[in-house]
Amino acid sequence: KKWGWLAWVDPAYEFIKGFGKGAIKEGNKDKWKNI
């Protein structure tokens, strides 16, 4: 299937975008020091 890869890539991209927005919302909280 030509677009078969989009079945994984598109949701993953949306997840990463959402995670990025969440990280920005959290700002510089100390939890990031624990990574």
Swiss-Prot record:
InterPro entries: Bacteriocin_lactococcin-G. Pfam families: LcnG-beta. One of its GO terms (biological process) is killing of cells of another organism. Keywords: Antibiotic, Antimicrobial, Bacteriocin. It comes from the Bacteria. NCBIfam families: lactGbeta_entB. Kills Lactococci. Bacteriocin activity requires interaction of alpha and beta peptides in a molar ratio of 7:1 or 8:1 respectively. This is Bacteriocin lactococcin-G subunit beta. It comes from Lactococcus lactis subsp. lactis. The lineage of its organism: Bacteria, Bacillati, Bacillota, Bacilli, Lactobacillales.
